[in-house]
């Protein structure tokens, strides 16, 4: 969440910056709550001073043998008024906190201003899309030829937006995940983690999915116990490992990676990408998370993005990098790069990774801090996350970019060690 002090002292500046994201901040409501808060706080402080003075008078009156009953009654009355004032203050603060939980992060000054994905800025491209001298098939048709992708069987089990993978295609999917994990742990310095796929509400609030995006989540209600949610990304479980911690400066940067299934309701995706594996309720992803000193987070974002790019480069898949505009960034991001891989059947680039610097937005929600050696005081860390990569979409890209005229698939060179000698999937 945003810094409440910044919201109070720079309210209009914050509102103007949020407006570039298409978010309308209710300035009047916040000003009204802040005025009430100040008024009640001033009143309670004055009352506390009066109560302290009256309490002192009781001792003096008692020493003189005077009747202290009226003074005692006054002190008791003031104590009751103070309790009421505290309750009122707590209520006002709860309202302000509830508002804060719905406000997105402030975009960095380097983020291009724009209203939608149409105004994202291309930063660079890598590789050249292949030309085919035969009619291109999409990954669904290629999966049917090898009997490796079965959407009908998945629908029988679970309904729409699921897939069953078989044989060499299932092995290729596993190979991709293993390759990604090995690359990030072996060359990029991440520590592999295995985390729960079910989390409770505080974890999702910590990374920003709750309360605003509950409809995008799969919830498991339990009578008499805290609800569970299926993770929409390992960002939730990995980032929350530092919740409530004060981290020694020598431990930073912390670089974590995990391969997990991800679960999303796709509540706002009705009618989009209904064919194939591009948009599913359950998909695998290799997620990278970094926890860093605030002064180093923008540099870390460039490194995180490069780590994701390296996967595509080694797979020899053409891609481009976009700097997302203010109106297209995720809720918790200060700055985001999207990686889009070339999908031949669609004749366009499709998102395969999103790499974001969240600044201290998540850290403030989680109270994740580091001890600054210069001040000796705990300060909020900065957190970053990025897909390295979405495994299902990478599988789609490999199937389509490595297809041959007869519908067979060449196995990328870098994946052959994971495929037990299989070089072509038929």
UniProtKB/Swiss-Prot annotation:
Residues engaged in binding L-serine: 233-235, 287, 387
Disulfide bridge partners, by residue number: none
Purpose: Catalyzes the attachment of serine to tRNA(Ser). Is also able to aminoacylate tRNA(Sec) with serine, to form the misacylated tRNA L-seryl-tRNA(Sec), which will be further converted into selenocysteinyl-tRNA(Sec).
Regions that span the bilayer: none
Classification via Gene3D superfamilies: Bira Bifunctional Protein, Domain 2 (3.30.930.10), Serine-tRNA synthetase, tRNA binding domain (1.10.287.40)
Keywords annotated in UniProt: Aminoacyl-tRNA synthetase, ATP-binding, Cytoplasm, Ligase, Nucleotide-binding, Protein biosynthesis
GO cellular component terms, A-Z: cytoplasm
Xref: SUPFAM superfamilies: Class II aaRS and biotin synthetases (SSF55681), tRNA-binding arm (SSF46589)
Domain notes: Consists of two distinct domains, a catalytic core and a N-terminal extension that is involved in tRNA binding.
Record keyword Transmembrane helix present: no
Swiss-Prot/TrEMBL catalytic activity: tRNA(Ser) + L-serine + ATP = L-seryl-tRNA(Ser) + AMP + diphosphate + H(+); tRNA(Sec) + L-serine + ATP = L-seryl-tRNA(Sec) + AMP + diphosphate + H(+)
Gene responsible for this protein: serS
Annotated metabolic or biological route of this protein: Aminoacyl-tRNA biosynthesis; selenocysteinyl-tRNA(Sec) biosynthesis; L-seryl-tRNA(Sec) from L-serine and tRNA(Sec): step 1/1
Region (Disordered): 37-63
GO biological process, one term: selenocysteine biosynthetic process
InterPro entries listed in its UniProt record: aa-tRNA-synt_IIb (IPR002314), aa-tRNA-synth_II (IPR006195), aa-tRNA-synth_II/BPL/LPL (IPR045864), Ser-tRNA-ligase_type_1 (IPR002317), Ser-tRNA-synth_1_N (IPR015866), SerRS_1_N_sf (IPR042103), SerRS_core (IPR033729), tRNA-bd_arm (IPR010978)
Protein name (record): Serine--tRNA ligase
């Amino acid at each position: 969440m945003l810094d409440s002090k910044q919201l109070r002292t720079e309210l209009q500046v914050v509102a103007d910056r949020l407006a570039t994201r298409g978010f309308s901040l209710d300035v009047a409501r916040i000003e009204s709550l802040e005025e009430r808060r100040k008024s009640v706080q001033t009143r309670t402080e004055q009352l506390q001073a009066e109560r302290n003075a009256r309490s002192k008078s009781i001792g003096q009156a008692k020493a003189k043998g005077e009747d202290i009953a009226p003074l005692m009654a006054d002190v008791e009355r003031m104590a009751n008024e103070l309790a009421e004032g505290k309750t009122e203050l707590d209520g006002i603060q709860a309202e302000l906190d509830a508002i804060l939980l719905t406000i997105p992060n402030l975009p960095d000054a380097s983020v291009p201003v724009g209203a939608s994905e149409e105004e994202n800025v291309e930063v660079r491209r890598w590789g050249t899309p292949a030309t085919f001298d035969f009619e291109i098939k999409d990954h669904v048709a290629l999966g049917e030829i090898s009997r490796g992708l079965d959407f009908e069987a998945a629908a029988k089990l679970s309904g729409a937006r699921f897939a069953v993978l078989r044989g060499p295609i299932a092995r290729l999917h596993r190979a991709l995940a293993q390759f990604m994990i090995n690359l990030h742990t072996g060359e990029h310095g991440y520590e592999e983690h295995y985390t729960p796929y079910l989390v409770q509400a505080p974890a999702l609030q910590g990374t920003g999915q709750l309360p605003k995006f509950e409809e995008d989540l799969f919830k498991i209600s339990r009578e008499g116990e805290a609800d569970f949610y299926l993770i929409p990304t390992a960002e939730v479980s990995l980032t929350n490992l530092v919740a409530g911690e004060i981290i020694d400066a020598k431990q930073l940067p912390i670089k974590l990676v995990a391969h997990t299934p991800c679960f999303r309701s796709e509540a706002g995706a009705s009618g989009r990408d209904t064919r194939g594996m591009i948009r599913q309720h359950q998909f695998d992803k290799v997620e990278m998370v970094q926890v860093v000193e605030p002064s180093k987070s923008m540099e870390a974002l460039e490194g995180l993005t490069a780590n994701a790019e390296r996967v595509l480069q080694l797979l020899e898949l053409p891609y481009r990098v976009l700097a997302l505009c203010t109106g297209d960034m995720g809720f918790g991001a200060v700055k985001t790069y999207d990686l889009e891989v070339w999908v031949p059947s669609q004749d366009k680039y499709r998102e395969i990774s999103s790499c974001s610097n969240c600044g201290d937005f998540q850290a403030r929600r989680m109270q994740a801090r580091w001890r600054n050696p210069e001040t000796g005081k705990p300060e909020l860390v900065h957190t970053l996350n990025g897909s390295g990569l979405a495994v299902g979409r990478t599988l789609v890209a490999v199937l389509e970019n490595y297809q041959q005229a007869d519908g067979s698939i060449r196995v990328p060179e870098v994946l052959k060690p994971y495929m037990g000698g299989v070089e072509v999937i038929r």
